[in-house]
Amino acid sequence: MKKVKIALTKGRLEEKAIEIFKDIGVNVDELLNKGRKLIFHSENKEYNIEFFLVKAPDVTTYVDYGAADIGIVGKDTLMEKEKDFYEVMDLKIGKCKFAVATLPEIDIYKGYNIKKIATKYPKVARKYFRNKGIDVELIKIEGSVELAPIVGLADAIVDIVETGSTLKENGLVVVEDICNISARMIVNKTSMKTKQNEISKIIENVNRVVNN
């Protein structure tokens, strides 16, 4: 049985992804008691898996270069970073949406002046406003993008919205939803050939659990 290496996104998706693997019979004891470890081994008669936890943007890099065979990552990351791999499944966890938000008194769709948009996702934002025929200046923000309209850095933001509570607390409103997003399973193209039996088994079993 060939070892399958799986890169999991740290944080928001981690716990729910581990639950899915537990439900298909993977031993997740090391993942549940991880301490400061970076790599976690899981082997039984059904699976031989090596997990590692990385930040979301790095999951695609690990899979793209073949350091990981499978990755679990949000669709938001996939939309922002185009790589060469298979996107095989919607895991239906980590559900949220991309949205445009601003202060209630600002109408970003009126007037001909170039609007300033703050976002962690410039590629997603650029495509959205281009399709609307609106000229924008994109400002890349790594921290709390909600701050940008409040302090006058930007007219609006494009960001992930889960419940909307953070926006409300900061006096912002959603003016339009862009698209729904959730966690996806991605697979390295070469690994799909060289470890076809092992990876196909994981995909089939996860699909059964997710769509049950």
Swiss-Prot record:
Any single Pfam family the record assigns to this protein: HisG
GO biological process: one example: L-histidine biosynthetic process
Keywords of this entry: Amino-acid biosynthesis, ATP-binding, Cytoplasm, Glycosyltransferase, Histidine biosynthesis, Nucleotide-binding, Transferase
SUBUNIT field: Heteromultimer composed of HisG and HisZ subunits.
Domain note: Lacks the C-terminal regulatory region which is replaced by HisZ.
PANTHER family: ATP PHOSPHORIBOSYLTRANSFERASE (PTHR21403:SF8), ATP PHOSPHORIBOSYLTRANSFERASE ATP-PRTASE (PTHR21403)
Protein name: ATP phosphoribosyltransferase
Organism: Clostridium novyi (strain NT)
The gene coding this protein: hisG
